[in-house]
Amino acid sequence: MNATSDSGDLDFTKAFDSPAQPAPSWEASSEAQKQEVTAGATELLKSGYYITIARKAPKVAPLQHDGRYSILCIDDDTELLKILARKLSLDGYVVRTAFDRQSIVAELQKLPPPHLILLDVGMPDISGLDLLQKLRQHPRLGSVPVIMLTGHVTPESVLHGMANGADGYVSKPFQFEALGTAIETVLGIQ
């Protein structure tokens, strides 16, 4: 199966054909919500703390047959992927990983789609923000919650990610407790 279109863009349409509900956009957020995110991100960055922002996704797919959530971790740092996979597995999640364009396409074509995607912003062969936009436009994957992971956090980058449909933003390096809280928030786990 050809995973890329002639233009080299990622093409997931051949793997999925059922429509999904579109994710709410940043533009649909109230001005108060936007100001809260902006102010919070700015203050955290000024104080030197790392930033973690997460909002509950409007709709999360049903649990797998074994009652666990599945998470797809996408990052070009294979060592970080190993650590994430081990830690998240110990926390009870089913974890899949992808580290380059080919493995990303292969994982996104699998059924069922993941309940959550952890997505690195800065990868060498594809921008995490570009991939996020493609995911949000995809009929089958558009409603899958996405938490962005990045080492380059500015208020503008956070706003750009949230405006393009990210459900959360976690800066690297991160503490697993902060990432775990963001995951639980987005998935609605109490």
Where are these regions (language model features)?
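Acidic, metal-coordinating helix/loop segments flanking the phosphotransfer/catalytic sites
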Residues: 97-116
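The feature encodes the CheY-like receiver
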Residues: 81, 124, 142, 154
